[in-house]
């Protein structure tokens, strides 16, 4: 997504209020939470000498007002484009805010130039995106308990889904149509590979491949917005995630209906291992898949080890609790608490937003896949199985919301262990 920054000749007429507004726009269009946008803009305004600053942010809109350095009251209103998750830009703007706090006397033209650089920065090349799809699809398939042959088939499908996503993003500007076509490719490749004898369970192959399309960050951010009482923005994000899951279901169902050798998906999707070797493999693959998926969210590479470790740890805890209790709430609550608490520690230590860690490493626990399966089975007329997955989706959502809310009650001072040098 491209943001229209002022031309060089126009920057001279812009002041500190415009710079703060532009930063808010970058954050909004990068998928930042409402409170994150308001907090960052407030810190930047304070650093730039804007007094009595106030801001109101809603989905696709930013409004600010304050007293400039001349003591004059100014207000700004700006409509933003549809947000897309780009945690790298979010982290860069956060760094710029800290830089302004340390060096407040920077010219406005310099701030605009830095924001423009952030917007134009290329974090990953198309080949890296495709590689992430391959590793993510194969890893998550194995993390869910599939066999090595099914994981390999999911990785092969991930190649074509990744290529398709690159092509669709260039020529198709409707997001839900991109998702429908990408999920159709996943179903096509999974059934072809299964037909050729590459793979044992087509449902697991499709599921592993579709993990790279599941809108995990939208669900996590929506839950965080609800816990902050930002119901309008939370609902908008949740609907974005729901529409993506609906698009995935339509794409898979349409392709399966077309192919003469395809069959409807079964209710068996994953088999959590009970052996230590199996649990170890699933844990490692969950961490690898989390790190690979972070590429699609444009997370800087320096955080991959943190994210992979956290993703693996949360999935290990989930498997241990589930294998010993078979209690859904406990199996999600404690891993979610691990992710939220660790994310806050890492945010202070790494000096970056907790969203960078929370949105990515929470991915193995997110309820998006359950919602996709619920919609799919409801569409094919299997109401019992559809309602069962729908129940699991809402249960996971509210459990994660409880974990996030509990962690937010802890004062920030308890998470300060030291600063990274």
Where does each model-flagged region fall?
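Short glycine/threonine-rich loop/turn motifs
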Residues: 368
């Amino acid at each position: 997504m491209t943001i229209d920054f002022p031309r060089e000749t126009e920057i001279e007429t812009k002041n500190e209020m415009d710079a703060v507004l532009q930063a808010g726009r970058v954050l909004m269009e990068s998928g930042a939470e409402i409170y994150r946008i308001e907090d960052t803009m407030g810190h930047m305004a304070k650093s730039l000498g804007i007094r009595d600053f106030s801001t109101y942010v809603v989905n696709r809109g930013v409004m600010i007002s304050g007293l400039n350095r001349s003591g004059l009251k100014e207000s700004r209103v700006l409509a933003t484009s549809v947000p897309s998750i780009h945690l790298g830009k979010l982290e860069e703007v956060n760094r710029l805010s800290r830089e302004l706090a340390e060096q407040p006397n920077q010219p406005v033209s310099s701030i605009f130039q830095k924001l423009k650089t952030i917007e134009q920065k290329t974090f990953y090349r198309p080949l890296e995106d495709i590689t992430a799809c391959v590793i993510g699809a194969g890893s998550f398939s194995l993390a869910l308990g599939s066999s090595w042959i099914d994981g390999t088939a999911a990785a092969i499908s991930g190649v074509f889904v990744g290529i398709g996503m690159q092509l669709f993003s260039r020529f198709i500007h409707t997001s839900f149509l991109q998702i429908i076509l990408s999920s159709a490719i996943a179903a096509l490749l999974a059934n072809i590979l299964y037909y050729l004898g590459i793979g044992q369970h087509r449902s697991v192959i499709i599921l592993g491949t579709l993990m790279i399309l599941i809108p995990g960050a939208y669900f996590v951010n929506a839950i965080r917005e609800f816990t902050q009482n930002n119901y309008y923005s939370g609902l908008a994000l949740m609907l974005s995630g729901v529409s993506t899951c609906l698009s995935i279901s339509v794409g898979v169902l349409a392709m399966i209906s077309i192919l003469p050798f395809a069959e409807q998906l079964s209710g068996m999707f994953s088999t959590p291992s009970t052996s230590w070797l199996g649990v170890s493999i699933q844990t490692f693959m969950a961490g690898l898949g989390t790190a690979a998926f972070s590429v699609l969210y444009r997370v800087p590479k320096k955080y991959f080890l943190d994210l992979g470790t956290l993703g693996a740890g949360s999935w290990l805890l989930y498997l241990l609790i589930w294998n010993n209790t078979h209690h859904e709430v406990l199996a999600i609550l404690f891993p979610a608490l691990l992710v939220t608490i660790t994310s806050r520690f890492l945010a202070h230590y790494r000096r970056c937003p907790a969203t960078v860690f929370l949105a990515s490493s929470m991915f193995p626990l997110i309820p998006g896949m359950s919602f996709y399966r619920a919609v799919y089975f409801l569409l094919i007329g299997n109401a019992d199985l559809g309602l069962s997955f729908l129940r699991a989706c809402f249960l996971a959502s509210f459990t994660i919301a409880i974990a996030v809310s509990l962690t937010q009650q802890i004062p920030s001072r308890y998470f300060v262990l030291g600063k990274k040098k």
